[in-house]
């Protein structure tokens, strides 16, 4: 059997598909890749905030819905909190490091004033502005290779990226991992997800064999927070859960650049209930501080 996998055509996306494909091969399933151009690819110089929601996923998911592919593979942080009702999460791979990293000559505490850090994430911009208001941020688009090239050419004095992307690309640059209390990661950062048609029971059963249950539980808890509070790649909300045994450890943060709220939770239970509880805690504190997302 050969499974058709739809994904973006970027180098990082190809690597992510191959990571999932290797899991399939181990259970005797072959795969082929169907390259899809998304809105984010077609307007690669535009700020993400101007492109709307779902810019990394919509066209890829449509290929599955239209029967041109069996599975859509994404970096899970790029998919909306509300998935198309005809699609379903079939599997996630074991999570890579979920952290944000700073690529710069110095660590965050020792950065000079009035330098320019490259990031297109409103979450990262606001967290940085809260901690280091004297540092400038500037939008940066393009794949990871392009962004690093701009940094090396001194167009930027630093970059904030996801650690998982450097790991998957096998890049060996020096970087500084950012503390999760200062830079709480985007929901589902570091997770590769496979989406399929809800009615496709045969393929759904195949993907159960490669699903990493603890990672999925972490992902669902984080998505419950975002569903309650509102968020995604255009929102200054970070959330991270770690599951150890039956215990969930969660942290969620919001910043408008002037104020910052961080809440946490630690308890056993099911992902949706615990994620919702953390989301309600965050909403309550945001209301107390008169912050509206």
From Swiss-Prot:
Alphabetical keyword list: Porphyrin biosynthesis, Transferase
Example GO BP: protoporphyrinogen IX biosynthetic process
EC number: 2.5.1.61
Origin: domain of life: Archaea
Cofactor: dipyrromethane
Record pathway: Porphyrin-containing compound metabolism; protoporphyrin-IX biosynthesis; coproporphyrinogen-III from 5-aminolevulinate: step 2/4
InterPro entries: HemC, Porphobilin_deaminase_cofac_BS, Porphobilin_deaminase_N, Porphobilinogen_deaminase_C, Porphobilinogen_deaminase_C_sf
Catalytic activities: 4 porphobilinogen + H2O = hydroxymethylbilane + 4 NH4(+)
CDD domains assigned to the protein according to its UniProt record, in alphabetical order: PBP2_HemC_archaea (cd13644)
Cellular compartments per GO CC: cytoplasm
Note on how the cofactor is bound: Binds 1 dipyrromethane group covalently.
Annotated positions of the S-(dipyrrolylmethanemethyl)cysteine modification: 233
UniProt record similarity statement: Belongs to the HMBS family.
Additional information: The porphobilinogen subunits are added to the dipyrromethane group.
Function: Tetrapolymerization of the monopyrrole PBG into the hydroxymethylbilane pre-uroporphyrinogen in several discrete steps.
Record-given protein name: Probable porphobilinogen deaminase
